[in-house]
Design a protein with these regions (language model features):
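Positively charged, phosphate-engaging catalytic surfaces used for nucleic-acid and nucleotide handling
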Residues: 1-75
């Protein structure tokens, strides 16, 4: 992904993390609470098999749609 798109995507990931603070369900592996920023980044990496910086530019809009899905469906 080009630098400009990667930067925009990182900002969107951070905003999604802000939105998800306190919304993720409890998990026994995270007794002090879950990190919503890491959750979004890990979900993106898992779905697209690459770090957000390494996803092709052609998938930029698809990544944004997926992040919106994560916000609507905290898990």
């Amino acid at each position: 992904m080009n630098k400009e798109n990667a930067s925009k995507l990182w900002k969107i990931i951070q905003e999604a993390g802000d939105y998800l603070v306190g919304q993720l369900p409890d998990h026994p592996n995270h007794p002090k609470g879950r990190n919503p920023y890491a959750h979004v980044a890990i979900c993106v990496k898992s779905k697209f098999n690459a770090s957000y910086k390494d996803i092709p530019d052609e998938l930029y809009n698809e990544v944004i749609k997926y992040i919106e899905f994560l916000k609507e469906n905290p898990s």
